[in-house]
From Swiss-Prot:
Entry keyword set: Antibiotic resistance, Cell outer membrane, Lipoprotein, Membrane, Palmitate, Signal, Transmembrane, Transmembrane beta strand, Transport
Name of the protein this chain belongs to: Multidrug/solvent efflux pump outer membrane protein MepC
Localization in the cell: Cell outer membrane
Purpose of the protein: The outer membrane component of an organic solvent and antibiotic efflux pump; confers resistance to toluene, hexane, p-xylene, ampicillin, penicillin G, erythromycin, novobiocin and tetracycline.
Gene Ontology CC entries for this record: cell outer membrane
Organism of origin: Pseudomonas putida
Residues with a covalently attached lipid (S-diacylglycerol cysteine): 18
Length: 484
């Protein structure tokens, strides 16, 4: 009988060669073959290493930021959830894949029963015994039309999409930590600038007030000087609050507090980032994990159509076992005590009020939805990269212009202060020079922050942030199908 069970399993695999999953065709990318061109864009540069393969330690030069990114990759809760989701979908795939194989189980049982005389066929009371041992297969579905294989394929693609989702989460985390860090650094620089400016304003206010007491400055001059002081105090409180909130944001991203032994940060205007090559739009289809995730979900929806189609056809399940049955435990495995059971069952759908057709329509609609999501993901990626490329050149020009503006305001401030001290110009001109310089310095810090975050977002948009070191892409194998 054991040979019969083996033959049955082999027959099931031979019969189960039909699949109703539609042939998969990758949708055309609904974007241009080249990045936008124009006055706002620099010529795209080629490089030996794509941005997605550039390690974040090589991209970010600030040792303090590198330390924070490493901390976040260990402790961040969103990344932990993404990893657990990956494990969960892997387990679900293994559960579904198990339905491809017959579940073989062994059972053993024994019973003793006393039968009273009035219930016995012989008219006498007695004790009956029965022992059994069986090995068999229970309700194994012959996958003649590929329903189980379609569901297994769907589970596999869902699992693979979760792997790409985990990559997306890490890439987003690296960019978020970098942007939060640069915001923290910029707000600290603004706070320090405001603190120094407030001291200057207070000195000017005290000087103007003393001048008013001796009749040199007017009450209007005193009022204007005080206005500048109070305005700086408003900024002082604002940046003090922002610095504290920046620390709180970083703490959440890190999953723990900022390390006490944090490395010394680079200055905000130092060489913070490496150059990232844009490559071609077709490259992001292979390197952006969110695009890969969307395609795996599309393949999962495509596989589900096969399962919905298979539901229209008969399903056959088999139950079979072989074993021994004996009233005496000692003779359970003796010759002549063998027993077997073979119980096929067929289920043929006849009338279901259109539910099977509706299920098939639903699965096709879900595929169309996933096609649209896949195309939208590509379009979003194209926009993000295009925005980053436009920002690269324009921010360079904007920053240079802002530096020139700061220099011009510093010259204006020095001249206005000198002329005010010797009594040529009024206090109003001096206060105007102070305000203009303060505003220009704040704008320079803000523009530098915007430039840094734009480059970080471009690195993220190109798929960068998954590898710690450049060159790891060639060392790591692609995701493997999990084994039982």
């Amino acid at each position: 009988m054991t040979k019969s069970l083996l033959s049955l399993a082999v027959t099931a695999f031979i019969l189960g060669g039909c699949s109703l999953i539609p042939d998969y065709q990758t949708p055309e990318a609904p974007v241009a073959a080249q990045w936008p061109q124009g006055p706002a864009y620099s010529p795209t540069q080629s490089a030996d290493v794509a941005a997605a393969e550039q390690g974040w330690r090589q991209f970010f030069h600030d040792p303090a930021l590198q330390q924070l990114i490493q901390t976040s990759l260990v402790n961040n809760r969103d990344l932990r959830v993404a990893a657990l989701n990956l494990d969960a979908y892997r387990a679900q795939y293994r559960i579904q894949r198990a339905d491809l194989f017959p579940a073989v189980s062994a059972t053993g049982s024994g019973s003793r029963q006393r039968v009273p005389a009035n219930m016995s066929q012989t008219g006498e009371s007695g004790i009956t015994s029965q022992y059994s041992a069986t090995l068999g297969v229970s309700a194994y579905e012959l996958d003649l039309f590929g329903r189980v294989r379609s569901l297994t394929e769907q589970a596999l693609e869902t699992y693979l999409s979760s792997e790409q989702a985990r990559r997306s989460t890490q890439i987003a985390l690296v960019a978020s930590v970098a942007n939060a860090y640069y915001t923290w650094q910029a707000d600290q620089a603004l706070f320090k600038l405001t603190e120094e400016t407030l001291k200057t304003y207070e000195e000017s206010y005290n000087l103007t007030r003393r001048s008013n007491e001796v009749g040199v400055a007017s009450a209007l001059d005193v009022s204007q000087a005080r206005t500048a002081v109070e305005g700086a105090r408003v900024k002082y409180s604002q940046y003090q609050r922002l610095v504290a909130q920046d620390v709180n944001s970083l703490t959440v991203l890190l999953g723990t507090g900022i390390p006490a032994d944090l490395a010394k940060p680079l200055e905000l205007d130092a060489d913070q980032l490496a150059e990232v090559p844009a490559g071609l739009p077709s490259d992001i289809l292979q390197r952006r994990p969110d695009i890969q995730e969307a395609e795996h979900l599309l393949k999962a929806a495509n596989a589900n159509i096969g399962a919905a189609r298979a539901a229209f056809f008969p399903s056959i399940s088999l139950t079979a076992n072989a074993g021994s049955l004996s009233p005496d435990m000692g003779h359970l495995f003796s010759g002549g005590q063998g027993t077997w059971l073979f119980q096929p069952q067929i289920n043929l759908p006849i009338f279901n009020a259109g539910s099977l057709k509706a299920s098939l329509d639903y699965s096709k609609i879900q595929k169309d939805i996933n096609v649209a999501k896949y195309e939208k993901t590509i379009q979003t990626a194209f926009q993000e990269v295009s925005d980053g490329l436009a920002a690269r050149k324009t921010f360079e020009e904007q920053l240079q212009a802002q530096r020139d503006l700061v220099q011009a305001n510093q010259d204006y401030y020095r001249l206005a202060e000198r002329r005010y001290r010797i009594g040529i110009d009024s206090n109003l001109t001096f206060l105007d020079a102070q305000r203009n310089l303060f505003s220009a310095q704040q704008a320079l810090i803000g523009d530098r922050l915007s430039q840094l975050t734009s480059e970080v977002n471009l690195y993220k948009a190109l798929g960068g942030g998954w590898y710690e070191q450049t060159g790891q892409a060639n060392q790591q194998a692609s995701v493997e199908t999990p084994k039982g």
